[in-house]
Amino acid sequence: MISALDSIPEPQNFAPSPDFKWLCEELFVKIHEVQINGTAGTGKSRSFKYYEIISNFVEMWRKTVGNNIYPALVLALPYRDRRIYNIKDYVLIRTICSYLKLPKNSATEQRLKDWKQRVGKGGNLSSLLVEEIAKRRAEPSSKAITIDNVNHYLDSLSGDRFASGRGFKSLVKSKPFLHCVENMSFVELKYFFDIVLKNRVIGGQEHKLLNCWHPDAQDYLSVISDLKVVTSKLYDPKVRLKDDDLSIKVGFAFAPQLAKKVNLSYEKICRTLHDDFLVEEKMDGERIQVHYMNYGESIKFFSRRGIDYTYLYGASLSSGTISQHLRFTDSVKECVLDGEMVTFDAKRRVILPFGLVKGSAKEALSFNSINNVDFHPLYMVFDLLYLNGTSLTPLPLHQRKQYLNSILSPLKNIVEIVRSSRCYGVESIKKSLEVAISLGSEGVVLKYYNSSYNVASRNNNWIKVKPEYLEEFGENLDLIVIGRDSGKKDSFMLGLLVLDEEEYKKHQGDSSEIVDHSSQEKHIQNSRRRVKKILSFCSIANGISQEEFKEIDRKTRGHWKRTSEVAPPASILEFGSKIPAEWIDPSESIVLEIKSRSLDNTETNMQKYATNCTLYGGYCKRIRYDKEWTDCYTLNDLYESRTVKSNPSYQAERSQLGLIRKKRKRVLISDSFHQNRKQLPISNIFAGLLFYVLSDYVTEDTGIRITRAELEKTIVEHGGKLIYNVILKRHSIGDVRLISCKTTTECKALIDRGYDILHPNWVLDCIAYKRLILIEPNYCFNVSQKMRAVAEKRVDCLGDSFENDISETKLSSLYKSQLSLPPMGELEIDSEVRRFPLFLFSNRIAYVPRRKISTEDDIIEMKIKLFGGKITDQQSLCNLIIIPYTDPILRKDCMNEVHEKIKEQIKASDTIPKIARVVAPEWVDHSINENCQVPEEDFPVVNY
């Protein structure tokens, strides 16, 4: 398919390449100065100033250089540059120390290694390295180095990275690197170091630079993922893109179509897919697209985010861990495949967890054959999107599948086509989910039989159905790092995105059904969402290895700011009572995938974070290099997420979320309360009384949260007056009513001073009865013995008021509370206490199926009990199943029994049921060793 853009000739510059120093001073330095010093005294906003600097630079380039900005753009956006240097912080530090002839482990080298602790605002490793160089030599006055020269040196650096390994010993001997170090000015050198480290040179302003160059540049880059192509086609702002320009092009990465997660009944899912769909197994791997060109002479592998992994999987049919095993019919000149790269364990014949994918490819690469390693990459193909010059995306799914099967010959356990079966109706979904669970799979993907392929979308045509596991908070969350606290083990504070006003309001509607049955094409996820701010949500330390800590440090180094020195901007970051020691701009940060057991809004934790709730049992699964920070989990995603699982200490999620947007003073309160309040006439019930409201109130029967502001407004509407300081005693104490249902710090202080505290129910019941009612025991939150004695005389032995009428509901409640002795409830353990080893498994009820009398079983059960868990002999009552045996026959027998009971559970339910995770016994020991419950899916039961 030929695009109109293909006929556009490549732009040519009419002037020679400008100096690299000019690029640094006219663009990099000016943007850096605005970041550090702001725009005080100019009367301009930072955003306006950035646009002014960038637009001036773009205009100068067009007038003095020409229409080809690629040489400068690839230096300004180094993380978009496809050149790979394999130069990390440590290597660069050792290289510069060796170049300066400093002794090994010298004081200077140690300072540089610990540069993060001493860097100031706006500083980074590159600036510190230049400082050390400047102390020992004068600034060179040699001939200027042009932008083209720099790109030539970077080409050489990238080309020789495999020559003798990329260590500091080889880098210090590299001629292009040494030439730059010895001949660049100090300003140039700083940005040269940033470029080879792949740091963000213009600090999050890349989109402004792209938009200033061409209004469609950013959109086109999201489809093409290649700066050179973007700049060669889009250099005239008057020439705009057409819709077909944003289609798939062989050789260029694109954003794939994604499956949508829904929380609907099987019946509604079927209706959404028109009762005609293909069922595929959901793979636990990395989304990879294969671009096959010129009969296999050139092959490229791209990730979902356009990262080029060709070096891992092979560049042609002649070599590579995957590419040499691609078998197409002779008629295939070029094509594009969509699929999942997983790791296959050749010995156990199972697919391994996601994190091993690239590691297996590297190991196979070093052995030159996947037959020589225990585990290796396996490419599972599920779609064909392009064939011999024609895009197949408009074709129906079943037709694309037919073409795929006709042109590709699978090779078992290396390149396979994902099996799919055409299904109709509810029972087929249940059956496919049963099979997925029995195989230990992630779940299934249901695809509308006649659906087209929509690039960069997530719509109703593809729906993923995953088993719902007890003691887990739905899907894993992709969260952005916004803060850091040091300790024996660093902990990172993570945040939720708040989208712009329009999208925020859109998500406040009825979310009971996420899928719109009336349209299959409307629900396309916008990959470029506008983020208004970020709210602190949780802190995570568990699950991050030392290597990952180092990698996070390397990626974010130089971008952290100490909170004590520079306050985080309230317009971007909002924290609760817990403020991190350091914070980071989200555009400079990194995304982590977090697994959690449930939400936690206990009294001790709800104030710590801006969301008024946090995660319980959070655990880092991995670093999401493929995720942009703007695509992370949002506040609205949290609203739409399912009810918190079985942990009894947590309430239903909607009441948990106390997600009060402080800026907008939103109130999470049901429409029914608003309607009831509006129906109440304005009265003088509270005339002459003064009220001091100390807390919100959550109604016992419905779980509706009535905020402090709502209570105050209601009191005023009915004649009461508000005061905000009781201690001053400017009013008659007999006229004052203190209202609270929580022992806040202020409330406790007033109790200690002898004040009586009434429950908010008294206010609401006064309004309901349309008069002041006497104080009775149920209205006494914390009062003196004298007042309580008087109150108790106003009710009978059941607590029924002698004066006020009682509703049927309240009478039933009183009867049950007085005449039945409830069994001892579960011990509610504060989330802080749960961190102690004694309570590690306090939320677990484990089932250990037995096939013989064995010490293995006894030891597992003993460990669960020792660390606060419980054991049950009924699978239906558990939230964790542990298969104890190493013997394959016994293990298989246990698993068959477990799966039969799970199948019965699925058949009996109209929606996706919540089931217990099944784990190998190693899960218990690993959890104890790490002092946290490690992810269950990392310990599947295999070899049965």
UniProtKB/Swiss-Prot annotation:
Location of this chain's protein in the cell: Nucleus
The signal peptide here is: none
Q: Supply the alphabetized keyword list.
A: ATP-binding, Cell cycle, Cell division, DNA damage, DNA recombination, DNA repair, Ligase, Magnesium, Metal-binding, Nucleotide-binding, Nucleus, Repeat
**Gene Ontology molecular function:** ATP binding; DNA binding; DNA ligase (ATP) activity; metal ion binding
Kindly state which reaction or reactions the protein catalyses: ATP + (deoxyribonucleotide)n-3'-hydroxyl + 5'-phospho-(deoxyribonucleotide)m = (deoxyribonucleotide)n+m + AMP + diphosphate
Q: What happens when the gene is disrupted?
A: Delayed meiosis I; sporulation results in an increased proportion of tetrads with only three viable spores. Very mildly sensitive to ultraviolet (UV) light and methyl methanesulfonate (MMS).
Record-level GO BP terms: cell division; DNA biosynthetic process; DNA recombination; double-strand break repair via classical nonhomologous end joining; double-strand break repair via nonhomologous end joining; maintenance of rDNA; nucleotide-excision repair, DNA gap filling
* UniProt-listed CDD domains: Adenylation_DNA_ligase_IV, BRCT_DNA_ligase_IV_rpt1, BRCT_MDC1_rpt1, OBF_DNA_ligase_IV
Cite the EC number.
Answer: 6.5.1.1
Which residues of the sequence carry a binding annotation for ATP?
A: E280, K282, R287, E340, F382, E442, K447, K464, K466
By its UniProt entry, which InterPro entries does this protein fall under?
Adenylation_DNA_ligase_IV (IPR044125), BRCT_dom (IPR001357), BRCT_dom_sf (IPR036420), DNA_ligase_ATP-dep (IPR000977), DNA_ligase_ATP-dep_cent (IPR012310), DNA_ligase_ATP-dep_CS (IPR016059), DNA_ligase_ATP-dep_N (IPR012308), DNA_ligase_N_sf (IPR036599)
Q: Which SUPFAM superfamilies match?
A: BRCT domain, DNA ligase/mRNA capping enzyme, catalytic domain, Nucleic acid-binding proteins
Note the subunit structure: Component of the DNA ligase IV complex, composed of DNL4, LIF1 and NEJ1. Interacts (via BRCT domain) with LIF1. Interacts with NEJ1. Interacts with POL4 in the DNL4-LIF1 complex.
Would you identify the family this protein belongs to, as annotated? Belongs to the ATP-dependent DNA ligase family.
Sum up the protein's function in the record's words.
DNA ligase involved in DNA non-homologous end joining (NHEJ); required for double-strand break (DSB) repair.
Cite the PANTHER family for this sequence.
DNA LIGASE 4
Q: What is this protein called?
A: DNA ligase 4
